[in-house]
């Protein structure tokens, strides 16, 4: 496990470049900081300053090396590097509320932006006019869209929102997409068509994160009522739900076709598996607990605690987990959704941790990624 403390401020979101030598993070403000690996250290190389509201989403396209950002200023920017300088291009989102989340499509020819305007902006580049334009998916979304994930076919888009529902839409844009083949989610895919809807008002909570599996047949999501859910399109849209005893999870991602990692307010990642019978199971917390020891607090730690945990108390408040506050995002570091070898977490404590499954398997008895 390698932990790096970037800041005292929370890291609201992050994204890696293709060869994992650079990470883009937002220190809970209107800026994006790009750090480059130099030996064992991370050195700040660039600051992207164009937004005038909190940045809420970052995604870095691996093939085209473009960064897309969105923020509370209702704007999105596509950043391209020229002669070592990152240049922004404004995207016309046509929204009247904050943008909340952004994600490049697998082919990198479009991206989707969720927002508080109860809609999803699907953006693509119009070469005739030399600008990025957007189309809106509105119905039947009833509240803020918190999370998005693309199906591997580059057309279907999963969205989790504050109306307690997870939906799968078609984001087919005839200007840039080839006609999609039929999938277990459905065969007819005109733009904006809702292919599936899960969740309800009687139970559930805000859907904080959604993730398709590598095949695209399974969709996982985590809600504010501490549940983890998986829908399987190949099993007639059957849904498996696990009500956990933990604090709410904020981020989820598939690390193999049947395993997923989720993390949130409990400050440590957790492994869940989904078997061929459609059963969803909690496997283990993936942290290596530190033994807490009684000690006097230094002046430096006192000030750090004021920033990190809003406390000045002398008693030792260090958590036994590596992260000292809620984890806000989980991403794959080494590998892909078919076979992930290492994954990354960032959190409100301003820290970034890279977790190695081989190391975790040697520490945690009986742990095996399916």
Curated annotation (Swiss-Prot):
WD repeat boundaries on the chain: 6-45, 50-89, 140-179, 202-241, 244-284, 322-365
Cross-referenced Gene3D superfamilies: YVTN repeat-like/Quinoprotein amine dehydrogenase
Name under which the protein is recorded: Actin-related protein 2/3 complex subunit 1A-A
Any one of the GO CC terms: site of double-strand break
Location, primary (coarse class): cytoplasm
UniProt subunit comment: Component of the Arp2/3 complex.
Domain of life: Eukaryota
Keyword vocabulary terms for this entry: Actin-binding, Cytoplasm, Cytoskeleton, Nucleus, Repeat, WD repeat
MF GO annotations: actin filament binding
Chain's role: Probably functions as a component of the Arp2/3 complex which is involved in regulation of actin polymerization and together with an activating nucleation-promoting factor (NPF) mediates the formation of branched actin networks. In addition to its role in the cytoplasmic cytoskeleton, the Arp2/3 complex also promotes actin polymerization in the nucleus, thereby regulating gene transcription and repair of damaged DNA.
Top-level taxonomy: Eukaryota, Metazoa, Chordata, Craniata, Vertebrata
Keyword Transferase annotated: no
Transmembrane domains' residue ranges: none
Gene label: arpc1a-a
InterPro entries, alphabetized: ARPC1, WD40/YVTN_repeat-like_dom_sf, WD40_repeat_dom_sf, WD40_rpt
SMART domains the record matches: WD40
Compartments reported by the entry: Cytoplasm, Cytoskeleton; Nucleus
Family stated for the protein in its record: Belongs to the WD repeat ARPC1 family.
